[in-house]
Design a protein with these regions (language model features):
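Class I SAM-binding transferase module
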Residues: 1-180, 184-214
Length: 214
């Protein structure tokens, strides 16, 4: 059994895939990993204070860096959508931890106009399959893990991916975005972009503003 506590607010943002891929060589062929799998989610978010705090730093870097934050004055513009999934142990002959997701956020009829300041990120992890079913750990809003008193688990805050410029979304209009998990020589980074209702720039190209070292 390989037990780890490497999950970040976006699931894989603290290099859990790379660390576990390296450690799984000590597992027997029938060995198991805890966690067994995790999926990240993104949702467009209205969060003027977060955006202004990043903008006040006065440079591109701070508008292309994801932040782990406790979301207070915010509103999700659409329901979260699935981004990336990782499973362990990974028995693939060639392991590739790059990922790409095209995310379509349907808002539906009678939704009001909104301003998107970035994206809120979450994760949902399956720790293991127990006698009574799957044991999970999650900050994804629909499945957020609850404590014994019914309170939401407080161990992880969401992650916030800012946009360089806010995007105004008309009433009933949908949002489309793209997100990449990139792996390069000695580093891992994310890139993200909005392509509807307007086409915006790709953020953090080649990890120029933010990356995590391997």
């Amino acid at each position: 059994v390989l037990v780890s506590e490497l999950l970040g607010s976006f699931g894989d943002n603290e290099l859990s895939p790379e660390c576990l891929d390296g450690a799984q060589r000590i597992l027997k062929p029938d060995g198991v990993s805890i966690p067994r799998a995790y999926t990240s989610y993104l949702a467009p978010v209205t969060a003027a204070k977060l955006w202004n705090d990043a903008k006040a730093r006065g440079d591109l870097k701070h508008m292309e860096t994801p932040y782990v934050v406790k979301l207070h004055r915010h509103a999700l513009v659409a329901e979260p959508r699935e981004a990336f999934t990782f499973k362990h142990p990974n028995r693939s002959r060639v392991i590739d931890n790059t990922r790409y997701a095209k995310l379509a956020f349907a808002r539906g009829e009678q939704t009001k106009a909104a301003t998107v300041h970035g994206f809120a990120g979450y994760f949902d992890a399956t720790l293991y399959d127990g006698p009574a079913g799957e044991v999970r750990c999650s900050i994804y809003p629909p499945t957020h893990t609850l404590g014994p008193g019914g309170e939401k688990m407080f161990s992880w805050f969401p992650i916030y991916f800012p946009l360089r410029a806010p995007v105004d979304v008309p009433a009933e209009a949908d949002v489309e975005a793209h997100c990449w998990r990139c792996v390069g020589q000695g580093k891992v980074w994310y890139e993200w972009a909005v392509t509807a209702p307007v086409v915006g720039p790709v953020h953090n190209v080649n990890g120029r503003s933010y990356w995590v070292g391997l």
